[in-house]
UniProtKB/Swiss-Prot annotation:
UniProt modified residues of type Phosphoserine: S114, S115
Residue ranges occupied by any C2 domain in the UniProt entry: 180-306, 317-451
Protein name stated in the entry: Synaptotagmin-17
Highest taxon, organism lineage: Eukaryota
Length: 470
């Protein structure tokens, strides 16, 4: 009889041995079952190329090298698995397991993707051999030289004024004898301290007398010259001398200042245009003088007598008008501000101009309302700053037009027409149409814009509203 203590100890030992054998036997069978065996098709390697060896595979290789248990497929015989009578695995079973693991490792190594190889064959251009036949028969063509192309080029077709192509090569005496338009005396001086250019128009001589309307005789009564000055390419900010009556040898002695940096002034061209003011035929260009300022010493200054050459610009600018438009939808009011005008044409030889602006509201083709500013005496650059308001319901706004006409006040006869623009439904040009569109898109906000005045004939041609007013 064993002691109860000894019986308890033996039972515990037997339980441990039985549990260990059961776990080993069951786990081995589970491992060898099909559910735990991965086929070659189930192996998937993800990641960037080239693929890296998994950590578990590297650990298996290191263990196999330490124990010299790695065999090739030719070293291990393919024998069926048998179990010993006591249920333990035989040596053939161990070899089969080793072979199975080795084959899976070899399969993974063989299927590891490598960097893709692109078989690039050289692209053959041109003829590979002289034996190949040409697709099209060869045609003998004439080889053109650059002279052949430039021989067909005619510069006169691209010149703004074909008659002035040889002016640069002529002296002032030759220009004078060729065109006989007279000569102009002027000077320039740049002030580095105040950054402005001063142009002095002194006098002109030998100007041609105007011809009467029928062309039969010279009309000395209408020889009233004046000079316009600008710095190209900017023709908007121009200056203008006074008109000298009934003379071909006018003396001006007038100075004009242009606020412009020195480097910018060197890139400009001084343009002086001599214009004859005819009371009946209006303003006729006699000739011009163009001086690139990069060719003169601006700081030192200088005086020049230059012969006038013909100008391709037969008509002078009529002037510009600065307007402001504002519409209030809730009140149904169209507000107009006449701010200022500049470089208006002179309408009176002795007094200059007394300009004023007439504003006329046209609904459709019907004149509704007329208003006008006060006239300012003896100026071609008037400042008005006058406001006007027209009652225009919102539903009628799209059919409304505003006609702005600048006149020179004349107490002895009818007022002298200077220029006109139309803004609204029947605008007289793209600038006027753009101003109207901007006002419609920004209600309750004043919209300012400069406009170049147009002739009466031009406005009547493009705007029906211009025909309805006087």
């Amino acid at each position: 009889m064993l002691e109860p203590l000894n019986e308890g100890l033996l039972s515990r030992i037997s339980d441990v041995l039985l549990c260990g054998w059961t776990c080993q036997h069951c786990c081995q069978r589970c491992y060898e079952s099909s559910c735990c065996q991965s086929s070659e098709d189930e192996v998937e390697i993800l990641g960037p190329f080239p693929a890296q060896t998994p950590p578990w595979l590297m650990a298996s290789r290191s263990n196999d090298k330490d124990g010299d248990s790695v065999h090739t497929a030719s070293d291990v015989p393919l024998t069926p698995r048998t179990n010993s009578p006591d249920g333990r695995r035989s040596s053939s079973d161990t070899s089969k397991s080793t072979y199975s693991l080795t084959r899976r490792i070899s399969s993974l190594d063989s299927r590891r993707p490598s960097s893709p190889l692109i078989d690039i064959k050289p692209v053959e251009f041109g003829v590979l051999s002289a034996k190949k036949e040409s697709i099209q028969p060869s045609v003998l063509r004439r080889t053109y030289t650059p002279d052949d192309y430039f021989r067909k080029f005619e510069p006169r077709l691209y010149s703004l004024d074909s008659n002035l192509d040889d002016v640069d090569s002529l002296t002032d005496e030759e220009i004078m004898s060729k065109y006989q338009l007279g000569m102009l005396h002027f000077s320039t001086q740049y002030d580095l301290l105040h950054n402005h250019l001063t142009v002095r128009v002194i006098e002109a001589r030998d100007l041609p007398p105007p011809i009467s309307h029928d062309g039969s005789r010279q009309d000395m009564a209408h020889s009233n010259p004046y000079v316009k000055i600008c710095l190209l390419p900017d023709q908007k900010n121009s200056k203008q001398t006074g008109v000298k009556r009934k003379t071909q040898k006018p003396v001006f002695e007038e100075r004009y200042t242009f606020e412009i940096p020195f480097l910018e002034a060197q890139r400009r061209t001084l343009l002086l245009t001599v214009v004859d003011f005819d009371k009946f035929s209006r303003h006729c260009v006699i000739g011009k003088v163009a001086v690139p300022l990069c060719e003169v010493d601006l700081v030192k200054g200088g005086h020049w007598w230059k012969a006038l050459i013909p100008s391709s610009q037969n008509e002078v600018e009529l002037g510009e008008l600065l307007l402001s438009l504002n519409y209030l939808p809730s009140a149904g009011r169209l507000n107009v501000d006449i701010i200022r005008a500049k470089q208006l044409l002179q309408t009176d030889v002795s007094q200059g101009s007394d300009p004023f602006v007439k504003i006329q509201l046209v609904h459709g083709l019907k004149l509704v309302k007329t208003k006008k500013t006060s006239f300012l005496r003896g100026t071609i650059d008037p400042f008005y700053n006058e406001s006007f308001s027209f009652k225009v319901p919102q539903e009628e706004l799209e059919n409304a037009s505003l006609v702005f006409t600048v006149f020179g006040h004349n107490m002895k006869s009818s007022n002298d027409f200077i220029g006109r623009i139309v803004i609204g439904q029947y605008s007289s040009g793209p600038s006027e149409s753009n101003h109207w569109r901007r006002m419609l898109n920004t209600h309750r906000t004043a919209v300012e814009q400069w406009h170049s005045l147009r002739s009466r004939a031009e406005c009547d041609r493009v705007s029906p509203a211009s025909l309805e007013v006087t």
